[in-house]
Amino acid sequence: MNEKRMGLQSVRVRNFKAIVDSRTLRLGPLTVFIGHNGSGKSSLIEALETYQSIVVDGLDVAMQRWLGIEHVRHLGAEARERAGKALNPMAFELSIGTSLRKSTRLEMSVNNDAAVNRMFIAHEKATHANGWFIEKPLEREEGALEAGRSILASARGGHGKVAQQVRAWQFLSLQPERMGMPVPQQRTGGRVRLAKDGSNIADFLIDIQRLDADAFDGIVRTMAYVLPYARDLQPMLTSELERKAYLQLAESNFKVPGWMLSTGTLRVLALLAVLRHPEPPPLVVVEEIENGLDPRSIHLLVEEIRTAVQAGVTQVVLTTHSPYLLDLLKLDQLVLVARDDKGEPRFHRPSDDAGLAEWAKEFAPGRLYTMGSLHEAAQ
């Protein structure tokens, strides 16, 4: 590629769910979060998704998922006011660019009044690498920019490009039971975006086929490796009453509809489709990517991810509990999340520990994880 693609270089989250302060966390082309259940891995992922939702949909819509800001705010950080100013905001700080030095710095503080009757974006600022910035004032004035609307929603120029990056992030929490069912086809034009649950995978594949037949054929050929007994796998359309898209697998002398396919097959197909898309999202975030997958399929997906990030076409963030998957990665691609003595999530880079770096010469990351060495080093 002639031009290096922008990526999410760092993130810091405060007062969101389990997180009091994540501190600034550097992200690479591939970053994999590991840790015990309840450690706080998902809180960081959900914070990124919530930030995207505020930028795209506004604060009210973003908080509907949590049934109100009071439920998603860290429980130990109640909204208070001092001298007429709100304290303990929920805060997001991100750096997006081709490198940390050449990044646009995004800052957003979200808060509510003490009675939880109103919520608002208390402060927001986007600072370009050249120093030029746009800002939403701390003081809230009636008739000013809508209290729940991000300044990135209508940003132009360099800030507009960063806003496009945020809008294009792809979060996946695949639900195979929904992915196999027929869904209404998108007929208004424009690019088809894969739903978070993967439910519109058939329509997504039809769009890929339209954009780049070679990319589509490559996905089908790769699926033949996953399903060696299958002759073909195609998205189909039905228009008996409503035009709907669905998947159909050709096997021997009969055809199998998408809702009869295995959960692993559907998950692999969706992940391949996102990674092989002719215009992939700048950031792909997948929680517990190993769910429903056999070791061979996990190995295939890790190779696909490695190819994509090395080519610079996308950036990938994963969470996993699979030691086998970890054995396929490098130590510097991992972030361990563990609770400290106060019960607060802390984010550790195992590769920063000299002792672990030595152990990694003899043991793969998955082995170090199951041995407890990663958690010991984080204490």
Feature map (PLM): residue ranges:
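C-terminal lobe/lid and adjacent interdomain/linker elements of RecA-like ASCE P-loop ATPase modules
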Residues: 1-6, 300-379
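Conserved lysine of the Walker
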Residues: 41
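P-loop (Walker A) phosphate-binding loop of NTP-binding proteins
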Residues: 36
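Conserved P-loop NTP-binding catalytic core
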Residues: 46-113
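Hydrophobic anchor at the beta1->P-loop junction of P-loop NTPases
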Residues: 33
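Conserved ABC ATPase signature
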Residues: 221-276, 283-296
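N-terminal pre-Walker A segment at the start of P-loop NTPase domains
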Residues: 1-20
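Electropositive, glycine-dotted interaction segments
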Residues: 91-93, 97-221, 225
